[in-house]
């Protein structure tokens, strides 16, 4: 995995957990359960704000529940 991709995914985990009041392990479990890490490989997500990325992650998870 490319270093920039890893850094982006870490930023997303941290922002998502902060917004939703989760721990890092809870967030990683959630992301793994719903395939969010694969979704975060989408290059277009890196060009928007983290706030918008969190919204996109929420929508991605909701579509899979």
Q: Where are the language model's segments positioned?
A:
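C-terminal alpha-helical interaction appendages
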Residues: 1-65
